[in-house]
């Protein structure tokens, strides 16, 4: 949309004043092409440059398209500054006619796997708010650098094809659409938006703490770039892997459709013997999806645990076991997965 067309839309003056910059207009237009959405949505804010840029872009989008959007930030209370930071972000966004609500993670905090557990808790709070407000779309600020970091982390952990391309632009979880419209944006462009529009963003000290795997990977990527590593080449590889993943996913979906039955009344999934007679990767993914479905998990169970239980199911001695919030039982020629309460 041109600057002239944007000026014709009813936009608060404090936001409209930021639309005189041609780079901002170019980034808004790029965002509009990437953000294909019709219904209302919730935006997850952290206070970092990525999420503040997302706050601005989604606000302009919602005004142009007359769509309702709501903004939430999670105060994890992992640092003593976090509550004041959340309140400061709320105050700054409020001055731009962006209403932000703070969600608080109360209770005991972990001493290990802090980032992973905090991420899960953040999504739990946000998904809960989506269900409460009957909004099906949750927008998050992952960008191209996150895509690269995720690829390297998964590769080091020995992930398969699906894991290597797991940061998808859109993912459905418990009927909530998790959407990442910034996945093709460079971090430097998001920092530009945040600085130009808000003249502010939070610098999280944990982003420099090398005790976290993601931070070590980030520094490794920076060093590789100094040695001539090109992001575009890796994005090409990722794109090819995604095509292969889609082909495998087709057969996974066929296996689930033809060889499993969902008993909604009893909240259980019945897997026919043919379910386990497919190529191993198809069985592995189909079974992993089944555990996620019945266990109502956001993240899949670790691959090694899936391997172990599939090995047991293949033996005549298998009776029952628990995994991922599910009870798995063998009954004659079928396997039944039910929710563990």
List each language-model region with its residue ranges.
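AMP-forming adenylation/ATP pyrophosphatase catalytic core
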Residues: 1-50, 68-70, 76, 105-110, ...
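Non-catalytic alpha-helical coupling and interface elements of nucleotide-dependent molecular machines
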Residues: 131, 195, 199, 222-229, ...
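Core alpha/beta nucleotide-donor-binding catalytic domains of modification enzymes
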Residues: 2-220
